[in-house]
Amino acid sequence: SFVGSTTVAKIVYKRATSNLKRCVALGGAKNHLIVLPDAHLEMTASNVVASMAGCAGQRCMAASVMVGVDNVQHIIDKMVEEAKAIVPGKNLGSVISAAAKERIEGYITAAEQAGATILVDGRGATVPGKEDGYYVGPTIIDHVTPDMSVASEEIFGPVISIIRAKDLDAAIDIENSSNYGNAAAVFTQSGGLAKQVMERASAGMI
């Protein structure tokens, strides 16, 4: 079993299977969370933000893209509230290096320049007594389109992009169009709609 970059995952998989070994190789991630309007407000907002910000977003199962179906503004507003309560240095650690901090903040800036809306901005985060630390605050970016780099490339930081979808079919199409297929999730109180995502989404884990 391997989790890491796509380049190395291909090498591991090729070498393992050439010797008839069973292998699970997960390479890269851009995990999509499909959120429907009927999703439980507090639970959904809390889990999405925790998945985005936990380990400062430096984990393969972190939430990277939220696909909001129809009108989920009430959930987004709650997410903003949850994210603003996170304090770098207290309940959010640093990213791994100065280069990582610069790269992550570059994605946020690129999204802003491309027309996205920064709802919570983690750029320039500092911690008293640790001013030289590599901190990026939780970041929520709304009105993102699938072609923006912040939505299509792995960031590995506490950043989540929100893409709006008119209905569940469009949301599943957005998830399936991603070059990454590590994991996906669905937030709804409808078993039938959840089953549709489970059956139609192309992610390896749902």
Residue ranges and their predicted role:
Residues 4-146, 174, 202:
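ALDH superfamily catalytic-core signature
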Residues 1:
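A structured beta-alpha segment of the ubiquitous adenosine-cofactor-binding alpha/beta core
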Residues 34, 84, 131-206:
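Conserved C-terminal structural/oligomerization subdomain of aldehyde/semialdehyde dehydrogenase
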